[in-house]
Amino acid sequence: MAMYTNQTAEELETWRCTSDGIFKSQNSIWMKINFVFVFILIFLTFYLSFKAARVLKNHNVYSKGSQILLMITLLNANLNQLIFLEIRIRHLVHIFINSEDPCKIEFHSPECTYDQTIYAFTSVMSTGLLSALTFDRFFALYASTVYVRNSKDSAYMLITVSIIVTVIVHIRTYGGVSRAGYVPSCTYPPQLSLNTYQVVNNAIFWIIMANCVLTIAVLLLNIYKDKRIKKSVFDTKTRYNSFENVLTTKAICSVTSTQFVFLSFSTAALAIIRTLEAGMSEEVFHINIQYINGGVYGNLSIPVLIYLKTNQCILQRRKSIDKMTNHTGTVDSHISSLKTAWET
């Protein structure tokens, strides 16, 4: 990536004028199309999040702890989209004002301190919350008795841990790093933080992959446990709680897996682009970077999945309750007939 070098902060400050490739990419029609495309995705996220939050609040089918975690995950996704929207609007205005001046079309990195900080923080926080959702399902499976009584406390603890870890990662990545130099957009990290930034991105990829694998494992164990309960336990409450655990884990597995898919897409696409960078113009490189931002797609998928999976859970829950009610009635009548036959 041409804009990142091994230069010192003092040397980066002298590079006021951007390269011809970056200048062309900023003024490209494809960059303007990307603005429209991203704005549509972000406003769609806001609209669908309203619907998802309403169904979560009014028709909750999850434990209180899972509900809280899903709400916070939804809130963080919207905050990340909101700050991304602000960054992109600033970017668009900046391009229009400075479209003819290659020495003004880039942002001085200190100008991006606040919005880039919030954007980076909420991006890492989304991974922390996905991990929290995974551990929520893990606790529900292996500490079910304690979890049922303390699911809210468990959620608050997991959220607190997510925030603390995110703060530590953020300080480790950006703490004490000079914001010298110029960047095409405020989504770009400070140039002198690139090495640590890449390490963190790679770590996030593997963490989400681990979350995905663990959630699938918990889901399979839940399904296995549910089948055993159906065969050997006839207490309606126990059977229903087992069914609820499977439903909730399926929903959360969908969210985690989808985030992994989008991050994988973003990471793989970026790796391919960097491999081909030598034979690619700088203009094309920087335009492509704008289209492979997995975060904006992942954020959109969260309200979509919460809304669809919650409604699906409501329908399955209703069918299960009807089935269990009918089954209970059949068992009761069968036992009554056996008692009558025994007495006679």
UniProtKB/Swiss-Prot annotation:
Family matches, as InterPro entries: 7TM_GPCR_serpentine_rcpt_Sra, GPCR_Rhodpsn
SUPFAM superfamilies in the record: Family A G protein-coupled receptor-like
BP term (GO), one: sensory perception of chemical stimulus
Keyword match Transmembrane helix: yes
Annotated Gene Ontology cellular component terms: membrane
Predominant location category: membrane
Record field: transmembrane: 28-48, 67-87, 128-148, 157-177, 203-223, 252-272, 287-307
Membrane topology of the entry: Multi-pass membrane protein
Family: Belongs to the nematode receptor-like protein sra family.
Descriptive protein name: Serpentine receptor class alpha-27
Source lineage: Eukaryota, Metazoa, Ecdysozoa, Nematoda, Chromadorea
